[in-house]
Swiss-Prot record:
Protein name as it appears in the record: Uncharacterized 24.3 kDa protein
Record organism: Orgyia pseudotsugata multicapsid polyhedrosis virus (OpMNPV)
InterPro entries: NUDIX_hydrolase-like_dom_sf, NUDIX_hydrolase_dom
Positions of the Nudix hydrolase domain: 1-167
Length: 209
């Protein structure tokens, strides 16, 4: 779990930024309901991620094809887990709220890698480079109202899991959103992303901590 993380982002006032797959990992049939049809952008830590929330941010950009200029992220992640075919998966899921619109990287998701270059505080420059191999199934960006996501998961998708704690996760998301709406931000950190050209990144000053 310490090497796996995801980012559940909310666009104001109450829309969730998610991924939608057309087929399952196991089997090629197209269906209206299967495990992880709707999913949270997430992935595994790599050698460039200094902190686990950097894994969450990097995977969000790689999988959605979008990035944020300004966001408030709750600093305590939720440990989301589910069981599939006897294997239990665990991810540290960070929940955040985007200020303003998401920016488009202009590339198809998962066709590039993202490197985060840290600056002051949690300000990052992001560098995109082409990916030589892609083993991910095709997923598209989907942005839906929070309650619609909760209702869909509860009525259509949770019964595809042998077990999970998604119900507790939904309560956690509601709690984080309530704190944000009430301007109780002491447990949030502000993060910003700025895309730069790989050649420009080489000329930029080193990270500031």
């Amino acid at each position: 779990m310490r090497n796996s993380a995801g980012l559940f982002m909310i666009m104001e006032p109450d829309r969730a930024v998610l991924l939608c797959a057309r087929r399952a990992y196991h089997g090629g049939a197209v269906s209206d309901t299967f495990l992880e049809k709707i999913s949270i952008p997430r992935g595994h830590r790599d050698c460039t991620d200094a902190k686990i929330y950097e894994t969450a941010v990097r995977e969000f950009v790689e999988e959605t094809g979008r990035f944020f200029h300004s966001a408030y992220i709750y600093k305590f992640p939720f440990t989301l887990h589910w069981t599939d075919e006897g294997v239990t998966y665990k991810y540290s899921i960070y929940v955040g709220v985007v200020r303003g619109a998401l920016a488009d990287v202009k590339f198809k998701p998962n066709t590039y890698t993202v490197k985060l270059l840290p600056g002051a505080n949690n300000d990052y420059r992001i560098v995109l480079r082409p990916r030589r191999f892609n083993c991910e199934i095709s997923r598209s960006l989907t942005i839906v109202p929070l309650n619609q996501y909760f209702d869909y998961m509860t009525s259509k998708q949770l019964n595809t899991y042998a077990s999970s704690n998604y119900g507790e996760f939904f309560d956690f998301v509601r709690q984080v959103k309530r704190l944000f709406d009430n301007k109780q931000l002491h447990d949030f950190f502000h993060a910003s992303l700025q895309r730069v050209d790989p050649n420009d990144a080489l000329a930029c000053p080193g990270p500031q901590r």
